């Protein structure tokens, strides 16, 4: 048997057993990995010294707890952006640096990079994976590029135009409920609650052509979506439950899994029903029947989509994209609409100007509906929406992981492997970009003022190749909802100021409560 000399350890020759050799090889590999990680870590520390950082909270925990998902945390962030307008560095523990980017010039190299070069960092998005799968939100690389190309036609204005009737119908249902509640003396409403149900109602019709009546009666599917969103945000705050094994042992984890199954089963059933319809009718007859109803829903578009090689999306891919659209489409739009109504309640002069603009547009029209061509005829309402999206962007932050070194315009380098947070709120509150950033001023978005700013100064829908594919859908829905709401109601503030709560979506602690006052027929 071969002899192995371990005299350097003070031992004599010993038999070189396979297990000892395996132990030595494994130990050498582990040592090499530790040394490589240590070298990379210290090299990155050296290269990141050019990025300023606030004082650490603790030598071990670093800056954890400095910017909390609360109103106080938002104020701290605003102060940090004022102090470090070009961006800054935070440490999450002793070994995890995070770059916070909050200036248009600094984010340009990251936002313009491809999905393969600057993918989303899954630390912040991974909890959505069991629900949303490999949809546009979570996929990367070639799969993301292929899906993006195939989904783009789904958001062409010819597809979006017929959705206008759906938006009008859904908001009218919400308004009927508001009228009833106001007549019963319940004029103080949580905007998030009511608008979330309304956007989900619209989305089920636009995505699945399904009438759930969820604004008027409970819906198991809608309840599951709302529950999934809440569980993801709750888990994000519980570090000990970030491990899947531990999370799925908890009651929340088991409820999350059940809700996932319910949502997936609903989507799968719709897909299978359409798959059965297509072969019997043929594509031409299928499209003719759809033309009669004047609406091609999202599932239809996905089923008919083909890539450059003629390949279709799999059922699993279609489910992932439909579930992603339901998630992204309801929460973000509900957040955006709720905060616009809040600002218009706080600024009655702007609210009245918007109302007059809508009244002028719709005078002598019967029935009172917002049509596609009307959207371009509401310039001041659009300015008010954009200024609210600046102050309260529905998605406060997006993360990117650098798979290569990024050279910034000022010469600094972001090393490969570093996670960057493109802080949308930070950019929108940056005093070097926006004078008096905390003031609500719709005239910032007057055409003359827009010319003087970087296009990356205002990015509520992100920017670059991975920007929000559904932003035209979202803006159209927001304009319809706001125009009809201001036509029928006066929106008034309550005595308590909402406290911002930045999670995956920017919410308000305990809801965003406003008072609604029905307007008489003469006022309309």
Curated annotation (Swiss-Prot):
Expressed mainly in human liver, followed by kidney, heart, and skeletal muscle. GO terms for biological process: arachidonate metabolic process; blood coagulation; cytochrome metabolic process; fatty acid metabolic process; menaquinone catabolic process; omega-hydroxylase P450 pathway; oxylipin biosynthetic process; phylloquinone catabolic process. The modification 4-hydroxynonenal-conjugated cysteine is found at residues 45, 260, 354. It is found in: Endoplasmic reticulum membrane; Microsome membrane. Keywords: Endoplasmic reticulum, Fatty acid metabolism, Heme, Iron, Lipid metabolism, Membrane, Metal-binding, Microsome, Monooxygenase, NADP, Oxidoreductase, Transmembrane, Transmembrane helix. The modification 4-hydroxynonenal-conjugated lysine is found at residue 451. InterPro entries: Cyt_P450 (IPR001128), Cyt_P450_CS (IPR017972), Cyt_P450_E_grp-I (IPR002401), Cyt_P450_sf (IPR036396), Cytochrome_P450_Monoox (IPR050196). 4-hydroxynonenal conjugation impairs substrate binding and the long-chain fatty acid omega-monooxygenase activity. The keyword Metal-binding applies. The keyword Chloroplast does not apply. GO terms for cellular component: endoplasmic reticulum membrane. Heme binds at residues 328, 468. Belongs to the cytochrome P450 family. This is Cytochrome P450 4F11. The gene is CYP4F11.
């Amino acid at each position: 048997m071969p002899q192995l000399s371990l005299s350097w350890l003070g031992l004599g020759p010993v038999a070189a057993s396979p297990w000892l050799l395996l132990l030595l090889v494994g130990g050498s590999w582990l040592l090499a990995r530790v040394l490589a990680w240590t070298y990379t870590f210290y090299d990155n520390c050296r290269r990141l010294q050019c990025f300023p950082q606030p004082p650490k909270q603790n030598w071990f925990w670093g800056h954890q707890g400095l910017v909390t998902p609360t109103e106080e945390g938002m104020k701290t962030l605003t102060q940090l952006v004022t102090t470090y307008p070009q961006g800054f560095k935070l440490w999450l523990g002793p070994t995890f640096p995070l770059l916070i980017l909050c200036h248009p010039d600094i984010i340009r190299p990251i936002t313009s990079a491809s999905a393969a070069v600057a993918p989303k960092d899954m630390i912040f998005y991974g909890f959505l994976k069991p629900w949303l799968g490999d949809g546009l939100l979570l996929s990367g690389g070639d799969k993301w590029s292929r899906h993006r190309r195939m989904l783009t036609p789904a958001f062409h204005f010819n597809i979006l135009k017929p959705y206008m009737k759906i938006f009008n119908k859904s908001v009218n249902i919400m308004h009927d409920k508001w009228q009833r509640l106001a007549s019963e003396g319940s004029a103080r409403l949580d905007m998030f609650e009511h608008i979330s149900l309304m956007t989900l109602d619209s989305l089920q019709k636009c995505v699945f052509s399904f009438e759930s009546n969820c604004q008027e009666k409970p819906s198991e599917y809608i309840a599951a979506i709302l529950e999934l969103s809440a569980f993801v945000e709750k888990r994000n705050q519980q570090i000990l439950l970030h491990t899947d094994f531990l999370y799925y042992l908890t009651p929340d984890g088991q409820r999350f899994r059940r809700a996932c199954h319910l949502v997936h089963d609903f989507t799968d059933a719709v897909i299978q029903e359409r798959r059965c319809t297509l072969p019997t009718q043929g594509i031409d007859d299928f499209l003719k029947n759809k033309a009669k109803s004047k609406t091609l829903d999202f599932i239809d578009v996905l089923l008919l989509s083909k890539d450059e090689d003629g390949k279709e999306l799999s059922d699993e891919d279609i489910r992932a994209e439909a579930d992603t659209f339901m998630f992204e489409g309801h929460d973000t739009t509900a957040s955006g609409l709720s905060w616009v109504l809040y600002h218009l309640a706080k600024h009655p002069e702007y609210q009245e100007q918007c109302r007059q603009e809508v009244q002028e547009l719709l005078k002598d029209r019967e029935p009172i509906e917002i049509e596609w061509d009307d959207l371009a005829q509401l310039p001041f309402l659009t300015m008010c929406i954009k200024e609210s999206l600046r102050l309260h962007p529905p998605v406060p932050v997006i993360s990117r992981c650098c798979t290569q070194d990024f050279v910034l315009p000022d010469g600094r380098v972001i090393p490969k492997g570093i996670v960057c947070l493109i802080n949308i709120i930070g950019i929108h509150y940056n005093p070097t970009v926006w004078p008096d950033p905390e003031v609500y001023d719709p005239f910032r978005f007057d055409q003359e003022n827009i010319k003087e700013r970087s296009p990356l100064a205002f990015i509520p829908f992100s920017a670059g190749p991975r920007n929000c594919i559904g932003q035209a859908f979202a803006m159209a829905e927001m304009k319809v909802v706001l125009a009809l709401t201001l036509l029928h109601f006066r929106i008034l503030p309550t005595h308590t100021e909402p406290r911002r709560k930045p999670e995956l979506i920017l919410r308000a602690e305990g809801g965003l409560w406003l008072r609604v006052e029905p307007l008489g027929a003469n006022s309309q």
